[in-house]
Amino acid sequence: MLSNHYNIGVVEAGCDEAGRGCLAGSVYAAAVILPPDYANECLNDSKQLTEHKRILLRQEIERINILNASILAMHRALDQLKVRPEAIIVDGNRFKPYNDIPSTTIVKGDGKYLSIAAASILAKTYRDDYMMQLAEQYPQYDWQSNKGYPTRKHRDAIREFGISPYHRKSFNLLGDTQLSFDF
């Protein structure tokens, strides 16, 4: 059973993202505040934009790199909360300060805390829906199955058909060194 809160007695938001490790598609993030007495045995880790908006998001991801895009997406999700959290817990090991709210990163937090698990499920399911819509336009990449992740079939399709407008063209995987994919 997951823990209800990391910080007892404060309004806490759990944050997570989906899609950072993908070759295609946008990063989605969610922030969730749960009541102090919330319980749900089913809640656990989870492993309608216009085309123009999706392309703008892809360009933003490439410009600021995928990690920073993930953090920005989480900040934007926090901006949408109707209640201001007193603390933020984030799945993973990196997060940039959000306003003046204390934050804690928790590796595998989506398997430890309910609010992060809920945020993870929201981010993943919304992103999966988005990738299913794109799969209708680009069936050759098998996005209905791989959701943009770098499976063998997906990489083979890139080699055969080239990249789509939704593929990421670069990743910042090695610190300041930019790594470009040449398929």
Predicted regions and their residues:
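RNase H-like, Mg2+-dependent phosphodiesterase core
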Residues: 1-183
